[in-house]
């Protein structure tokens, strides 16, 4: 990987951490803290999520998910692997495995149902 490509990836990781902070999460890019340990997420700060960040024009989602899954398991924190990816001049998208997405959705649904019950007395 060339320097320009590495720099582009680092900028995206910093930008992603900044976006997470906008939502109230204490997020940071990890490369400068962890080096290349193999199990560190690209960005820390979303509890329970292993963040793999990719800013490239050619998508290799299955390869990236495999990397995220391996790294999440190696980290031993039981985090759900997720790939945050984008192309130039495009929105950030998130890819997760189906079962992991359903797990998140069930948690959201349970919180939503609880909120409705509290509002309806």
Predicted regions and their residues:
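Catalytic phosphate/metal-binding cores of nucleic-acid and nucleotide-processing enzymes, i.e., regions
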Residues: 1-121
């Amino acid at each position: 990987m060339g320097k320009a490509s590495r720099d582009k990836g680092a900028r995206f990781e910093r930008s992603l951490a900044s976006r997470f902070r906008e939502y109230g999460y204490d997020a940071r890019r990890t490369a400068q803290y962890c080096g290349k340990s193999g199990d560190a997420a690209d960005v820390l700060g979303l509890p329970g999520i292993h963040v793999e960040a990719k800013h490239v024009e050619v998508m290799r989602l299955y390869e990236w998910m495999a990397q995220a899954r391996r790294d999440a398991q190696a980290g031993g924190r039981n985090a759900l692997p997720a790939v945050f990816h984008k192309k130039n001049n495009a929105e950030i998208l998130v890819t997760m495995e189906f079962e992991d997405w359903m797990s998140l959705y069930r948690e959201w649904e349970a919180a939503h149902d609880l909120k409705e019950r509290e509002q309806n007395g």
